[in-house]
Amino acid sequence: MARQGETCGAIIGAMAALNLVIGREKIKDSQTYQAAMIKAIELHSQFKEELKKQFDFTDEIRNSTCRYIQEKIYGRGFIMTDPKEREAFEAAGGHSEKGCPKVCAVAAEVAARELSELIKQV
């Protein structure tokens, strides 16, 4: 997020959407927090599984950091705060339909599926 190579902004957005639906309203509501955390963990796992499937990765996705996902897709991570590295990212297909936009689509798809199921329960 914010070109830092840390947690993928797409999954952060998916988690934020999930929290809007099932998150707690009061900080002391630990029961709601625990229930939401279970769903967030499930969403994160689904995101990694769907990335593996849609990008035809053979091994497991270990985490959801941007740099790690870049390594999986392009064979290397990029330092996105460096203009030359951003150019290399673009040249590698970073914003092509098989790059970052596809990762964002995976996160949106997984979130939409989960949120749809939650809304049906209401």
For the regions a language model picked out, list residue spans one by one:
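Conserved phosphate/anionic-ligand binding catalytic regions in large, soluble enzymes, centered on
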Residues: 1-16
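Active-site-proximal mixed secondary-structure blocks
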Residues: 25-26
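Amphipathic alpha-helical interface segments
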Residues: 12-21, 31-122
